[in-house]
C-alpha cells in the first residue's frame, strides 16, 4: 500500500 510500511505495498 505504501511500499515500505505495509507488506501489501
Swiss-Prot record:
It comes from the Bacteria. On the 2D-gel the determined MW of this unknown protein is: 15 kDa. This is Unknown protein 1 from 2D-PAGE. It comes from Fructilactobacillus sanfranciscensis.
Amino acid at each position: 500500500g505504501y511500499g515500505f510500511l505495509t507488506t501489501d505495498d
